[in-house]
């Protein structure tokens, strides 16, 4: 993962603010402020030679093989992201769809972010890693923020919708957040209690409505503990949750989560799972922000562990697709938003049980195709540009070239 995706290169988830998801858009300008095979959502810009991912060693040594477990995890997580987006318009008419939506949203982005943090452990301010952070995260963020804005102008008949690199729209928030988290990695590596500190910051953000929308800081700060958790993990921690006992325990845990989500669906504001707002903005008392942040952090960690427990560690047909999750993440958003803009959900049969099943299968199939090598080759110029022309050459490297 270290040199194989957004979380690996440097280390996702229609509509308006009221019903948006963890990757959903919000209106802009609101009053309160505002390498090859590297394209996976959790690996961009870091080189972690301990993780078993592809990273060239000095002297032209062979690259280590990618860890199939993490590629499988990223692929399955991106499938859940796409399915979650397809379920969103079904929630009002189907309590079951709402329960599935809530359950998935409780852990799919935390899982991505934990993996991103895990593959950021070796990140420092070395020149080559900063370059990968820029080309693997910052540049795709700029390109897709502009692309999504033009898409909204055209598809939503909103020709004056503004371009803003400080107010990410829809899916692009994750790239901006990852860029910020990755830059702060050296700080988290020197503090004594990084996870409690990150959790304190998240709690304070959840009770601070004046933070504003710029840089989507609420999400950056409220999701921060998951990234820091990833920085603190070691390979043995992943082995621990993949034991047979963990898989057995995960079954009643997931069943209980679904039952609770079914009960909570008509009673709970799903916006809590998006980590995009302070408690006061959700019409809740300020203290509930702290309570919900801590409670949801614990629940998300448990569900992420249960999710990891069922991830195969062997190479499978989908393992290679894990290197292309960034492509699936960013590209499927055009269809997810377009389906709303073009009123595809107005068709009655989609809101039937069989319609929901077919929609779920379609979402999984589409995002799978978007992760495939042909799509990666087609869009690599935007996702993984080399941009050697933009950086100064290393004097040592230049001397070697002359000799």
Predicted regions and their residues:
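Alpha-helical transmembrane segments and their immediate juxtamembrane cytosolic regions
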Residues: 2-30, 37-403
């Amino acid at each position: 993962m270290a040199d194989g995706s957004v979380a690996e290169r440097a280390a996702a988830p229609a509509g308006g603010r009221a019903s948006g998801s963890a990757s959903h858009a919000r209106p802009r300008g609101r009053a309160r402020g505002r390498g090859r095979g590297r394209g996976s959502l959790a690996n961009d810009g870091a080189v972690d030679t301990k993780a078993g991912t592809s990273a060239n060693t000095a002297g032209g040594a062979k690259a280590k093989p990618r860890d199939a477990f993490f590629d499988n995890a990223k692929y399955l997580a991106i499938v859940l992201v796409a399915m979650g987006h397809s379920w969103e318009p079904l929630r009002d008419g189907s309590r079951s769809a709402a329960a599935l939506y809530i359950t998935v949203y409780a852990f799919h982005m935390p899982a991505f972010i934990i993996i991103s943090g895990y593959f950021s452990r070796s990140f420092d301010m070395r020149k080559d890693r900063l370059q990968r952070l820029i080309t693997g995260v910052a540049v795709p963020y700029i390109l897709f923020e502009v692309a999504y804005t033009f898409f909204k102008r055209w598809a939503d008949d909103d020709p004056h919708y503004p371009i803003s690199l400080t107010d990410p729209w829809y899916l692009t928030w994750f790239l901006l957040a990852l860029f910020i988290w990755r830059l702060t990695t050296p700080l988290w590596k020197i503090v004594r209690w990084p996870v409690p500190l990150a959790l304190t910051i998240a709690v304070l953000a959840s009770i601070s409505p004046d933070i504003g929308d710029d840089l989507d800081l609420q999400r950056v700060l409220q999701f921060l503990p998951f990234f820091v958790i990833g920085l603190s993990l070691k390979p043995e921690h992943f082995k621990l949750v993949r034991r047979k006992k963990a898989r057995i325990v995960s079954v009643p845990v997931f069943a209980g989560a679904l039952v609770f989500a079914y009960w909570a669906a008509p009673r709970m504001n799903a916006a809590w799972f998006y980590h995009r707002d302070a408690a006061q903005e959700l019409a809740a008392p300020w203290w509930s922000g702290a309570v919900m942040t801590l409670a949801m952090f614990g629940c998300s960690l448990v569900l992420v562990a249960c999710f990891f427990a069922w991830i195969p560690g062997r190479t499978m047909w989908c393992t290679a697709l894990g290197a292309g999750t960034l492509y699936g993440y960013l590209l499927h958003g055009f269809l997810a938003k377009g389906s709303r803009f073009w009123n595809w959900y107005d068709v009655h049969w989609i809101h039937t049980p069989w319609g929901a099943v077919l929609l779920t299968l379609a979402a999984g199939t589409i995002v799978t195709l978007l992760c495939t090598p042909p799509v990666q080759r087609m869009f690599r110029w935007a996702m993984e540009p080399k941009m050697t022309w933009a950086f100064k050459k290393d004097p040592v490297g230049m001397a070697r070239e002359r000799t």
